[in-house]
Structures are given as structure tokens and as C-alpha cells.
Regions:
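Extracellular glycan-binding segments that recognize GlcNAc-based cell-wall polysaccharides
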Residues: 56-392
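A short, surface-exposed alpha-helical micro-motif characterized by mixed small hydrophobic
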Residues: 14-16
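H-loop/switch region of ABC-family ATPase nucleotide-binding domains
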Residues: 8-9
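Conserved catalytic/dimer-interface elements of ABC ATPase nucleotide-binding domains
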Residues: 22
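A cytosolic small-molecule/anion-sensing beta-strand core signal
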Residues: 25
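Conserved beta-strand-loop-alpha-helix hinge in the C-terminal portion
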Residues: 28-51
């Protein structure tokens, strides 16, 4: 026989060209055997940081998953497909909205996550789906398809940083002449929040609780969106340069909303100002460091409590990545309407992977299936199999 040494980071190349493989790290043999098996284990474990305990947890989970039947695992999850982030968002929404009518739709511009974050509570109060615009100058094909299928009487457009007036003209040209109402044109995320809140107050849309999040805490705010949808809760997104919240406090007081959740460290620093105004504040994920998992667990518990008894949720899972938010614009309505939550996993961090695995294993009875979101930025085949195995 011939032994060939291949130094490569391409797992596919190793699996395709070799019969056997050895994974050597820091001068020690970590694993050896069938090349395809070794490549898949390395693909789910190599190059990541984390504690020794987390590494062992992920290593064991990968081996367990790869020992299971592929068809059995694939029956426990699905992957959102599409040509781009807009089409994946809208396909996910249409799938989750199947069998429902929609007299109103919220169309969100995809230049900033703030549009979707503010729209989630608003859409929940209307019982409306969220459609991702897919472009600033015109609607994407997937957005047009979704709107034509839903055929709403009213379209609410959330357009901080876009879309442009051309899109409004396009909406108003539809044959059934929907009413088009827009928020946020040419203004900041906080002004967008204020405009949507004022409309909701005037039409008695809101519940008895509001949420305040900082613009920079985009992961926390997207994780929160299924719950704000389900609670019909207004969301105020603070500008990064925000110095006070007096205008927000005045608006909340005018609507007799006195329960305020301050989410993330960026919003929590204003607690004294809200408390001084006589509002009851609740701090969520206010500590330093990664607070995303804390937000996820809170939302998961809430959505489980309002879900159908004896029926586990289809849990949405995405990678924790700064560039991931365009893939997650419709998770608010998808999760809120179907009593589901969004989990984010940092695929470069073993501690994050181990925490997700442990949580799924301990809550397997509450999760029927997994729905992976994210396209090329999402989780790979090894991570998908590993997570699905934990509920199988």
C-alpha cells in the first residue's frame, strides 16, 4: 500500500481522496480510522476554543450522532433553503403561516435588523406575518410571491435605512389596491420604534408590557422577537448614542404601560431613569459577556408555557454570527405564531456548543423537531446531526 500525507483544512478532500486518516493535534493522535468518519469528527470539533469538559461533551456527541442512522436523524430536522437571505426568510414564513389568512402584512427592510425587531411585536398585535423586502429599490421575487399569495388588505412597511419610495409605489400599484402605511422613512431606529408605537397606541394594539433593547445587541433582540410577537409587546430600539429615554418614558406613560423589560447591557444602564418615572423595570441579560443563551432560555420557557399541551415545538436554530441577522428577519412571526423559539450557537466555541447540547438533551420532551436557519452562514452538517441526535 501507499501512505500519503495530506496537510489540508478541506475535510471533503480528505474524505474523498483517502481511505484512512489520522487527526494529529499538538503532537498527539486525537483520532484515526475511516477517512470520512475522521473528517466529519474534525469538522465538528477542530479549530474551536473552549474548556476541556466542553470539548469532551462535543466529541462524545459527534461520535454518538455519526453512529446513528442518517435517515433517522434527518427525520428530526429540516433546513431552510433558498437562493439568498430574503428568499430563505420568506420561505420560512410561508411554511410557518400555511393555512392561515393575513388581512395585514408587515414588510421589513433588510438594511438593518431594527426593522424586524420593531415589527415583531407590532405584527403579533395584528396577527400578521412578516415579509422580508429583499432589496431597497424594488421587492425581491420572494417578497412579491409572498405578498401575492397572502393578498393582504393592509401592508405596514418598516423602512429605517430603506426600502425606498420605489417600493412603496410598487406596493400601491397592486391590482387589489392594499392600503400601505410606512414607518421609519429617513429616521433612526428609535424614531422608527416611536412611530410604530404611536400607531399601535392609537389603535389599542398593545399589551401591558414593553421591551427596550439597544441597537448593538442585535442577537439578543432577534432572540427575543418570538416572545414580543406572542405578547403583542411594543419594542423600542435605542440608538447607540442614546443619552436619555425621556421621550420613550412619556410615550409609555401615555399608553398606561408600566411594565418595562430592559434587555441587554445597553438598555439596562437606563434602569434608574425608568424607575424614577414610576415604571416597573425588569432587567434581562444585563450582565457583561455573552448573554444570548440567557435570553434564549427565557423565551424558550415562555413559548413552552403557551404551546399546545403534549406537542413539542419546532425549535429554530441559527449560528451565532455577527453577519447572521439578515437570515433571521422573519423569526419573530415564525416563532411567535407557532409557539417556538430561536436558539443561537457559536460554532467556533465549544462551550457554546456544549451548552446547546446539554439544554436540548434536558428538554428533549419539549422539542419535536429542529429547523436550521442560515444558508452558508448557518451550521454545518456535523453540527446539525449532533444537535438532532440530542433530541432523537
Amino acid at each position: 500500500g501507499v501512505t500519503v500525507l495530506i496537510v489540508s483544512h478541506s475535510n471533503d478532500q480528505i474524505a474523498r481522496l483517502c481511505n484512512k486518516a489520522i487527526w494529529i493535534e499538538k503532537g498527539h493522535t486525537r483520532l484515526m480510522g475511516d477517512a470520512g468518519y475522521v473528517a466529519r469528527i474534525y469538522g465538528g470539533l477542530g479549530g474551536r476554543t473552549g474548556s476541556k469538559e466542553s470539548e469532551e461533551c462535543v466529541f462524545d456527541a459527534l461520535k454518538t450522532a455519526l453512529a446513528k442512522d442518517d435517515d433517522e436523524l434527518k427525520s428530526r430536522y429540516s433546513v431552510v433553503e433558498g437562493e439568498n437571505s430574503g428568499s430563505r426568510n420568506n420561505r420560512m414564513m410561508l411554511q410557518s403561516w400555511k393555512g392561515r389568512e393575513a388581512s395585514s402584512v408587515c414588510l421589513v427592510g433588510d438594511s438593518t435588523h431594527a426593522n424586524a425587531v420593531v415589527a415583531s411585536g407590532f405584527a403579533g398585535a395584528l396577527g400578521a406575518p412578516i415579509v422580508a423586502c429583499g432589496g431597497n429599490e424594488k421587492l425581491s421575487e420572494s417578497a412579491e410571491h409572498a405578498l401575492l399569495e397572502l393578498h393582504p388588505d393592509k401592508i405596514f412597511v418598516f423602512r429605517s435605512d430603506g426600502p425606498e419610495d420605489k417600493v412603496i409605489d410598487q406596493l400601491e400599484s397592486y391590482s387589489w389596491k392594499p392600503t400601505v402605511i410606512s414607518f421609519g422613512e429617513g429616521v433612526t431606529a428609535t424614531d422608527l420604534s416611536q412611530q410604530a408605537f404611536d400607531y399601535g397606541r392609537d389603535y389599542s394594539l398593545w399589551g401591558d408590557e414593553a421591551y427596550v433593547v439597544d441597537f448593538t445587541d442585535n442577537s439578543q433582540s432577534l432572540l427575543l422577537s418570538p416572545m414580543t410577537y406572542a405578547k403583542h409587546a411594543p419594542v423600542f430600539v435605542l440608538n447607540p448614542w442614546q443619552e436619555d429615554c425621556s421621550a420613550i418614558i412619556a410615550s409609555l406613560t401615555s399608553a398606561n404601560i408600566n411594565r418595562i423589560a430592559l434587555v441587554g447591557p445597553g438598555a439596562s444602564k437606563f434602569q434608574d431613569e425608568f424607575d424614577s418615572a414610576g415604571l416597573r423595570t425588569n432587567l434581562i441579560a444585563a450582565g457583561e459577556g455573552d448573554t444570548c443563551f440567557e435570553v434564549f432560555k427565557m423565551v424558550f420557557d415562555f413559548m413552552s408555557s403557551i404551546g399546545r399541551s403534549g406537542s413539542g415545538m419546532e425549535l429554530m436554530i441559527a449560528s451565532r454570527d455577527f453577519d447572521q441577522w439578515p437570515e433571521l428577519l422573519t423569526v419573530g412571526c415564525c416563532g411567535g405564531a407557532n409557539h417556538s423559539a430561536l436558539m443561537m450557537m457559536d460554532k467556533t466555541n465549544l462551550d457554546s456548543e456544549a451548552a446547546c447540547l446539554d439544554y436540548l438533551a434536558s428538554h428533549a420532551s419539549s422539542v419535536s423537531r429542529l429547523l436550521f436557519v442560515g444558508g452558508r452562514l448557518g451550521l454545518g452538517a456535523e453540527e446539525q446531526a449532533m444537535l438532532a441526535s440530542s433530541i432523537a
